[in-house]
Design a protein with these regions (language model features):
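N-terminal Rossmann-like FAD-binding beta1-loop-alpha1 element of flavoenzymes
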Residues: 4-31
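Conserved Rossmann-like nucleotide-cofactor binding loop
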Residues: 14, 37, 164
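Rossmann-fold NAD(P)-dependent oxidoreductase module
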Residues: 21, 113, 117, 170
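Glycine-rich FAD pyrophosphate-binding loop
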Residues: 23-47
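Short phosphate-binding/catalytic loops that engage adenosine nucleotides
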Residues: 27, 67, 123
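Active-site-adjacent segment of FAD-dependent monooxygenases/related oxidoreductases
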Residues: 43-113, 117
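A conserved beta-strand/loop element that lines the FAD pocket in flavoprotein oxidoreductases
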Residues: 119-131
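Conserved FAD-binding catalytic core of PHBH/FMO-like flavoproteins
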Residues: 132-133, 138-210
Length: 210
């Protein structure tokens, strides 16, 4: 690898956006992700996903890398929460002043756009590369790939590999690291609400429904 080579673990939203920032600085960037390339996987095989909401901080980051105008067409403004009670009634609670909104966006489509932008800028994305261990003493990262294990010696490693981070687990084994993990008691249910006969949203698209 080059002397300015950066290795990012995780090709999710954070990892791919970080790659875009670094490529714009002229650095050599490699992203490794344990999952297959979602662009080659039909949506129904890709697992469930909750739409995410973009607020001011998210838009500011996208603006800094020149992606705001590309992402905006994928997003729907939400001006508040719509609370549904057990009797079928609803109450609308605005997020702020008139026209102040956060934006709902498909996590999958957003992630795909960021990965493609990172690749367009010259980052290399290695899918199906599961990080098994990071050896800080020997500056070595071990990956499991479809063809077997490989070991690399990157100059810099950035962890963006989520809740069960392999990088964090490796750090815990080798240095004194405190962290806290909490689980909430709530469950998760995915509902599909088809459009009306006229092809319109069956529920107000400009609100977060609770």
């Amino acid at each position: 690898m080059k002397n300015n080579s950066i290795t990012i673990l995780g090709a999710g939203l954070i990892g791919s956006l970080m790659a875009i920032y670094l490529k714009r600085q002229g650095l050599d960037v490699h992203i490794y992700d344990k999952r297959p390339d979602k662009r080659k996987t039909p949506y129904y095989e890709g697992g469930r996903s909750i739409n995410m909401a973009l607020s001011h901080r998210g838009w500011k980051s996208l603006e800094q890398v020149g992606l705001k105008d590309k992402v905006l067409p994928l997003a729907i403004p939400m001006y508040g929460r719509k609370i549904h009670d057990e009797h079928g009634g609803t109450t609308f609670i605005p997020y702020g002043k008139a026209n102040q909104a956060i934006y709902s966006i498909s996590r999958g489509k957003f992630n795909q756009l960021l990965v493609e932008e990172a690749e367009h800028l010259g980052a290399t994305v290695h899918f199906e590369h599961k990080c098994l261990d990071v050896d800080f003493q020997d500056n070595e990262v071990t990956f499991e790939t479809p063809t077997g294990e490989i070991r690399l010696n990157p100059n810099v490693v950035i962890g963006a590999d989520g809740a069960y981070s392999a990088l964090r687990m490796s750090m815990q084994k080798q240095v004194r690291v405190n962290y806290k993990q909490e689980f909430i008691p709530h469950g998760y249910k995915e509902l599909t609400i088809p459009a009306t006969a006229a092809g319109e949203f069956a529920m107000d698209p400009h609100a977060l429904h609770i």
